[in-house]
């Protein structure tokens, strides 16, 4: 079991005791719908990793990082008080473009 503890700083725990503190994201991600967005990103990444025999823990770390980056972009564009889960999802294309 890999544990993802969602908060202003998301913690990702591995059964062997490793814990990663995600450096991206902000308190605006605590609003309704952003947990669902994160779950969808995680599901998509894990499905691809399983097909390509990629380490699932590293995949979860990457997915959480990217979700946080989208949240950071949404905060800059809309402000964390008013940003929504839809805003975060829309910012994913900018994240992927930035990472290419």
Name each region found by the language model.
Residues 1-100:
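Small-residue (G/A/S/T)-rich helix-start motifs and N-terminal tracts that mark the onset
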